[in-house]
A protein has these predicted regions:
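Generic hydrophobic, amphipathic alpha-helix propensity
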Residues: 34-43, 59-60, 84-96, 167
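Short, structured helix-loop boundary elements
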Residues: 35-36, 56, 78, 82, ...
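Amphipathic C-terminal alpha-helical segment
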Residues: 128-132, 140, 164, 173, ...
Length: 224
């Protein structure tokens, strides 16, 4: 005779306890839009407050997340910093490539693009990347380079190299035409260094327009 009470559930029929992590919240599941919101918020806070002074809690609060939710998207605050820089460089590369295509498309049929026009376009795009709307990503890279790990730094440096490589053919063409007298590698370093420094002093409410800046930079480095 069975000693179990009537209606008892066999072990094989008992409901199983869920295993693994608890079910993700909406903030944690939406890995696309929410991740981008985190990236933009992190870029803005890292630029305004600095990497060391910004906590993951600050970033989560900026987008209305719980304090632990960012860790479903990034392993650490350091990984988020590297992600901000990587996204900034990928965006910069895409915008630069689009600029060069537009310059080539605007050249007369069968003619090569003007190195002056192409360089001016690159300078203007670079200013927009640094100073235009949603422009926190690259300034964070300029400010917080030393906060990266060596492995992160190497990955971002590869993207930087690819971005800067597009400037060299234009400077070489200008040198061949007698318009540039400096070593092209040094000229590129000095030019980009001067443009990048604009994040320290530019004020859109008081300073010249980005077009004015591009014209002035071209005239300074490649005088007529």
């Amino acid at each position: 005779m069975s000693t179990e009470p009537a209606g008892a559930v066999e072990p094989s029929q008992a409901p199983r306890r869920p295993r693994g992590r608890p079910r993700k919240t909406a903030d944690e599941r939406d890995d696309g839009n929410r991740r981008q919101e985190l990236m933009r918020a992190a870029a803005k806070l890292f630029r305004a407050q600095g990497f060391a002074a910004t906590s993951t809690r600050d970033i989560a609060a900026a987008v209305g997340m719980h304090s632990g939710s960012p860790f479903y998207h990034f392993k650490s605050k350091s990984a988020q910093l590297a992600g901000v820089m990587e996204q900034g460089m990928h965006s910069a590369l895409q915008r630069q490539a689009a600029t060069l295509r537009a310059v080539q498309a605007s050249a007369p049929a069968g003619a090569a693009r003007s190195p002056d026009a192409a360089l001016r376009a690159l300078i203007r795009t670079h200013f927009d990347i640094l100073l235009g709307p949603d422009s926190d990503f690259i300034p964070v890279m300029l400010y917080e380079w030393r906060s990266l790990t060596p492995k992160q730094r190497a990955a971002i440096a590869k993207l930087q190299h690819d971005y800067e490589a597009a400037w060299l053919p234009l400077l070489l063409a200008l040198k061949d035409a007698g318009r540039l007298h400096a070593d092209v590698h040094l000229a590129r370093l000095l030019l980009l260094g001067a443009l990048n420094w604009s994040v320290q002093w530019y004020d859109a409410k008081q300073a010249a327009s980005l077009d004015d800046l591009a014209d002035a930079a071209l005239a300074l480095f490649i005088p007529h």
